[in-house]
Structure formats: C-alpha cells, structure tokens
C-alpha cells in the first residue's frame, strides 16, 4: 500500500514538472515568417543590367559568361537579440526550370548554395559588376527539387538551412542578406531555375520567406527557477508528512 502511494506521489510530482516545463516552453518558443526587403538577380553576359523588381529570381550555370546569381535580404529586427535560434529556413517557391533538350539541361539535383554577404547592396542597383562580396563561412547548400512549379502550382519549395547564418546576424554580425548561386558554374549545358519573388506576384503565397524559430533563454531560466521552487516545496511537504507520522507513532 505504501509502495502504491509512493508511486502515485512520484507520478503526480513528475506530472506537475511536465506541465510547468511545457507551459514555459510554449511561452518561450516563437516562430516568425519574414518576407524580403530586397531581391534581385543578374546575368553575367549583361553585367550592368539590374533585375530588381522582376517577378522571377533566376539561378543559372552555363559557360561563356552566362551564369546568373541572385541576392536577397531580410530584416530580422523582429527577432529579439540574445535569443537561442533553434532553426532558420530560407524557402523559395519554384516557378520553372529548363528541361533536357539541345543545349539545355534539367537542373534537378544540382546544388545551389547560399552565402552570407559581407557588403551592403541595393535591390534596384545591384548588377554583376558591382555585386557585393560574400563569405563561405556557415554557407548552406541544397539540391534543386524535382518537378515544375508554375503560377497555378503545384507548390514546390526549395529550402536551405540558414540557422548558423541567422544566429550570426542575431549575435551582431552585419546583416546584408545572402547570395544564391549554383556551386558549379560554367556548365557545358545551360541549367537554369526560376523562382518567384515578392515583386509582381499575386499574394504572399508566392513570396520567398525566412522562417525563424527561436527560444527566449529568460523563459528557460524562469522555468528552471519554478521547478527548483517546486522541488523545495515538495521536499518540505514530504519531510513534514514524515515528521507528522513519526510523532503519531
């Protein structure tokens, strides 16, 4: 009988701990979805052309100066400083890709990388000649997914894990955005992928996005403090009950 009571008390205590931690984590964990503040791409063969404001964002690999790169920036000021970044995902909605014919190739499976920019730029002025520099530190890569998108679907997204890059920005590294490019430029066939932008598209379902999930450490510390307090109170209650039993005997 005493064993059953002890197990019941232990389970009750663990349940209270679980509810406490669950509530605090629910309060402390947040996910925000951010849309771009600037976006553009440029074609190497027309080095002074700017494509800011275009409805597409094109990444291309082909020889004889036909590569294309794209730049995109997000304002992450809505994410508090000194929080723990749990995940950050860049998502681009696929529009269309080249297919295998003549000098064209299907880019499915090709690796596109995202690099952190180290210089400021403007979506309405950036081109191949004045493109900002970048670093491969904490870069992210992803294979081009299969299938064709289109204005009416299906919905096909290409994702990159930018957790480390966003953590750097949140820690004070200047946020100039990122560049997206094929990791093997100057291909013998023309491999090209077009994504939708936040310009000239019907609604936010087409927009590129940066999805950030973060944890506020203050909530964690508060949860630990409450659990510690609960433990002390449980201990005092247990000792008092044991003392009462002893006095009764």
Residue ranges and their predicted role:
Residues 1-31:
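Hydrophobic secretory-pathway targeting helix
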Residues 20-21, 228-242:
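Alpha-helical transmembrane segments
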Residues 24-58:
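N-terminal leader/pro-regions and domain N-caps
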Residues 35-38, 163, 167-224:
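Proprotein-processing/basic-patch segments
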Residues 41, 47-48, 97-174:
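Beta-strand-rich interaction/scaffold domains
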Residues 44-99:
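A short beta-strand-loop element at or near the start of a globular domain
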Residues 71-75, 84-95, 115, 157-165, ...:
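Residues within well-ordered beta-strands of beta-sheet-rich folds
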Residues 243-249:
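Cytoplasmic C-terminal tails of single-pass
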């Amino acid at each position: 009988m005493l064993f059953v009571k002890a197990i019941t008390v232990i389970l009750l205590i663990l349940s209270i701990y679980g509810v406490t931690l669950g509530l605090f984590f629910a309060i402390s964990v947040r996910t925000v979805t951010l849309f771009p503040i600037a976006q553009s791409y440029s074609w190497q063969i027309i080095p002074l052309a700017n494509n800011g404001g275009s409805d597409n964002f094109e990444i291309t690999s082909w020889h004889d100066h036909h590569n294309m790169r794209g730049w995109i920036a997000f304002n992450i000021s809505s994410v508090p400083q000194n929080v723990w970044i749990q995940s950050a995902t860049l998502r681009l909605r696929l529009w269309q890709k080249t297919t295998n014919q003549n000098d064209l190739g299907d880019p499915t499976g090709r690796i596109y990388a995202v690099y952190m920019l180290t210089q400021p730029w403007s979506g309405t002025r950036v081109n191949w000649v004045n493109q900002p520099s970048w670093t491969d530190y904490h870069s992210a890569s992803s294979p081009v997914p299969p299938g064709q998108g289109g204005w009416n679907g299906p919905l096909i997204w290409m994702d990159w894990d930018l957790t480390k890059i966003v953590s750097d920005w949140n820690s004070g590294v200047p946020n100039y955005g990122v560049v997206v490019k094929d990791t093997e430029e100057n291909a013998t066939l023309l491999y090209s992928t077009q994504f939708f932008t936040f310009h000239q598209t019907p609604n936010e379902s087409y927009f590129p996005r940066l999805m950030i999930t973060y944890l506020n450490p203050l909530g964690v510390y508060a949860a630990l403090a409450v659990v510690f307090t609960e433990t002390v109170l449980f201990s005092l209650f247990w000792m008092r009950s044991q003392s009462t039993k002893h006095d009764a005997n």
